[in-house]
Every structure is written in C-alpha cells, then in structure tokens.
C-alpha cells in the first residue's frame, strides 16, 4: 500500500513538472529499425544547454536456421548542447546496460577483440554494463521534426555463459568475463519535438 502510494505520488509530481520543461522529444533510431529491433527514445530539456536522453531497444526474434540475436538495451545519456537544446552540435555522456542471447551466426569476423566467429558453433548468453562519450549533430527539418546523427565510444563489461549450440541447454562454460572498448553508440534518429 505505501509503495503504491509513493509510486503514484512520484508519478504525479513528475507529470506536474513536465509543463515547466522547455521541450520534450520522442525518437526512433533508424539503424535499429533497419535490423528489425524495436526502439524508442525520450529526450527532455533540463536547462538551456543540457538535456537528458533515455533510449532503449529490444530484439526478441529467433531467426531462421537456429540463429539467435536476442537482446535488450537501455542507454541513458546526459547531453551538453553547444548552442540550444535540440539543435546543432552536442556532446553526450552515456551509460548502457542490458542482456543478450546470441548464437548460430556463421561468419568468421573478429572485430575489436570480439570473437564473433565463436558464435558459429556456440551461443553466448549474459549481461553487460558500461559507459561512454558521444558526439552528435541535430538538423531541424520542420517545426516539430528533426534528424540526428550520433557516434559514441566507450567501455562495456560483460559476463556470460557459453552453450554448445543455439538451442542447447548444457553449459560449456559459465561466468566468462570480457571487457570491450570501442563503439558503444551509433544512431540516425528521426525525432518528433512536442
């Protein structure tokens, strides 16, 4: 009872604060859309040169031939705008976290010390968390519409279990650790500003 009352109180306080906020925007990352990964972002202007972007995506599809590319990601980002919020150049400072279940991919690519070729005969299931910095630019198209491009680099820590195939349940290894350094964000966002 007290938890529900507290939660409702916080939601009502946040709702009353929204009209004070200069701008709110909804966005979708067209790069995720191209991979059939549903995604949504919300950005709120906090001050004349600062905003908070919270984006997330989920891919729950099992593909043909037993391949898996299931994952979810949450990525909050504080942004500093060089001119005004929602226009022009910005720097972003983001965190990221999520879970994944990948396997059955028959390509022999190694990229930034990641052994994607292992996914041909294995399935990796685990979680990750990290942080990074990004640079982006927003072009205003019309009163309510914008397009944004952003690239980020950073670090992610992941812990995962290894299975012998995309659908097998027997573990080959558990709690493996990997520290990734490289691109952590790539976006071409279509934005609607309220």
Say what each PLM segment does:
Residues 30-34, 56-62, 80, 95-101, ...:
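Transmembrane beta-strands of outer-membrane beta-barrel pores
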Residues 46-48, 79-84, 136-141, 193-194:
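Outer-membrane beta-barrel proteins
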Residues 26-41, 59-70, 85:
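Solvent-exposed loop/turn segments connecting transmembrane beta-strands
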Residues 18-22:
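Sec/Tat signal peptide C-region and signal peptidase I cleavage site
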Residues 24, 49-52, 86, 144-147:
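Repeated loop/turn-to-beta-strand initiation elements of outer-membrane beta-barrel proteins
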Residues 81, 180-194:
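Outer-membrane beta-barrel "beta-signal"
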Residues 26-28, 42, 54-56, 76-78, ...:
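Membrane-embedded beta-strand positions of outer-membrane beta-barrel proteins
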Residues 56-71, 100-111, 115-128, 157-168, ...:
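Extracellular/periplasm-exposed beta-strand and loop segments of Gram-negative cell-envelope proteins
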């Amino acid at each position: 009872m007290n938890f529900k009352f507290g939660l409702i109180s916080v939601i009502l306080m946040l709702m009353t604060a929204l009209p004070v906020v200069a701008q709110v925007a909804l966005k979708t990352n067209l790069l995720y859309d191209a991979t059939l990964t549903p995604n949504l972002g919300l950005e709120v202007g906090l001050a004349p040169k600062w905003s908070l972007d919270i984006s997330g995506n989920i891919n729950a599809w099992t593909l043909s031939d037993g391949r898996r590319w299931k994952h979810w990601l949450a990525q909050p980002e504080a942004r500093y705008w060089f001119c005004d919020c929602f226009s022009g150049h910005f720097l972003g400072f983001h965190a990221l976290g999520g879970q994944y279940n990948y396997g059955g991919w028959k390509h022999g690519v190694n990229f930034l010390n990641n052994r994607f070729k292992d996914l041909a005969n294995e399935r990796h299931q685990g979680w990750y968390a990290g942080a990074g910095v990004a640079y982006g630019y927003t072009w205003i198209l019309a009163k309510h519409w914008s397009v944004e491009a952003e690239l980020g680099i950073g670090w992610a820590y992941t812990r995962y279990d290894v299975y012998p195939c995309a659908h097998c349940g027997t573990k080959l290894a558990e709690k493996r650790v990997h520290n990734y350094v490289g691109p952590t964000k790539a976006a071409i966002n279509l934005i609607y500003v309220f």
